[in-house]
Regions:
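Alpha/beta catalytic cores of nucleotide-metabolism and tRNA/nucleoside-modifying enzymes
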Residues: 1-12, 16, 20, 26, ...
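Glycine-rich, positively charged N-terminal anion/phosphate-binding segment
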Residues: 2-10, 25-100
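Hydrophobic faces of well-ordered beta-strands that scaffold small-molecule active sites
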Residues: 20-24, 45-47, 75-79, 102, ...
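Conserved alpha/beta-domain cores
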Residues: 24, 81, 88-100, 114-116, ...
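Non-cysteine beta-strand/loop elements that form the S-adenosyl-L-methionine
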Residues: 47, 101-109, 168-178, 230-235
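Glycine-rich tight-turn/loop motif centered on a GG-T
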Residues: 111-128, 182-190, 247-252
């Protein structure tokens, strides 16, 4: 069965223009990544997860992670925590920031998150999980979605017990990554669980895990009944996988790869500042330039550079034609003045995902 990935669907009252969702990923899903995802076909993009404890403590770390660009909508901002009052407060701030959806993280397997009673550990405390969803759904008019794993332990089916209860508590959509927290990202995602979850709830279910091609996306949608697929690691430094999933199988040229990386560098510097961006970007060089696109020594050379101007010069020397592609990309960007940035809203963004 050939499913049209461009079909529109609704998450609560929010219209989503396509069945492809770009996953929330810690240390990855900055605004530059999300905007790129929208350009390449994602119908919905998500922020990396925001700590509600950071909001409570009014941490003065920079506010760039709550920028909402005019070209990002629809956008879900993801929050994590284990206190209903704090979650409700965070949800109100997410609404004020201009997001379209509040997403709740019940799937992060990272120990520094689960040891606080947040993330995937909430699957073992369904009562608390439901109170959190109810608190957020009551606090804001935005639709609330929940991203979760199959459970904490290998072989767990807790998602099938907890999922319907979360919907009763107010969740307008569920995203299932059918690996256990203990698996992290090893093994495979068991989408037979996704199909079971779809049969148990009357809200849209998004299938997450091991979606890296159009064929796989079509297969998962057809066999599970999910309304959409979520792409995560496959899109790191590789927006062209989103284009391929949406039906355009053209391989990117060297010039296109370099131009997109240069735009990503510039947008990240604008968002994070040059000092933070320099370290943040290093992992992206390998992601963009890998997959046989550029020699390994070239990638290693860029990682050792401490000046982003030097990185840009070296990239343009490797693909001079990228300059013209970059100019076109820059012309297509919206005016930065169209962004929403709440200077009065101190937040803290942690790792996890």
């Amino acid at each position: 069965m050939n499913i049209n990935l461009a079909d529109t669907w609704f998450l609560g009252g929010v219209e989503i223009p396509g069945r492809l969702v770009l996953a929330p990923m810690a240390g990855v899903s900055v605004q530059a990544f999300r905007r790129q995802g929208r350009r390449y076909g994602a119908g919905l993009v998500c922020s990396e997860m925001v700590s509600v404890a950071g909001i409570q403590h009014r941490n003065e770390r920079t506010l760039e992670y709550l920028r909402v660009g005019a070209d990002e909508h629809p956008l879900a901002i993801q929050i994590f925590g284990s206190d209903p009052v704090a979650m409700a407060e965070a949800a109100r701030m997410v609404e004020a920031a201009g997001a379209d959806i509040v997403d709740m993280n019940f799937g992060c397997p990272v120990k520094k998150v689960t040891k606080t009673g947040a993330g995937a550990s909430l699957l073992d405390d369904a009562d608390l999980a439901c109170r959190l969803v109810e608190a957020v759904a009551t606090a804001v008019p935005l639709p609330v979605s929940v991203k979760m794993r199959r459970g904490v332990e290998n072989g767990s089916r807790r998602c099938l017990e907890v999922g319907p209860r979360l919907v009763q508590a107010g969740a307008a959509s569920l995203t299932l990554h059918p690996r256990s927290a203990k698996q992290m990202y090893t093994g495979t995602a068991d989408h037979s669980l996704t199909a079971e979850l779809v049969s148990l709830v009357d809200v849209p279910v998004i299938a997450s895990g091991d979606i890296g091609s159009r064929a796989r996306a079509q297969s998962v949608l057809a066999t599970t009944g999910a309304v959409a697929v979520m792409v995560g690691r496959a899109a790191q430094g590789n927006p062209w996988v989103l284009r391929e999933i949406m039906g355009n199988t053209a391989e990117p040229s060297r010039e296109e790869v370099v131009a997109e990386l240069l735009l990503f560098i510039r947008e990240t510097v604008r968002e994070l500042g040059p000092e933070r961006a320099t370290g943040f970007l290093k992992k992206f060089y390998g992601w963009y330039l890998g997959r046989g696109r550029f020699p390994r020594p070239f990638k290693q050379e860029l990682v050792t550079m401490t000046s982003l101007d030097e990185v840009e010069t070296r990239l343009l020397a490797a693909a001079p034609g990228a300059r013209f592609v970059l100019e076109r990309l820059l012309d297509e960007l919206p005016d930065p003045a169209d962004e929403v940035l709440l200077d009065s809203l101190p937040i803290s963004i942690y790792g996890g995902g």
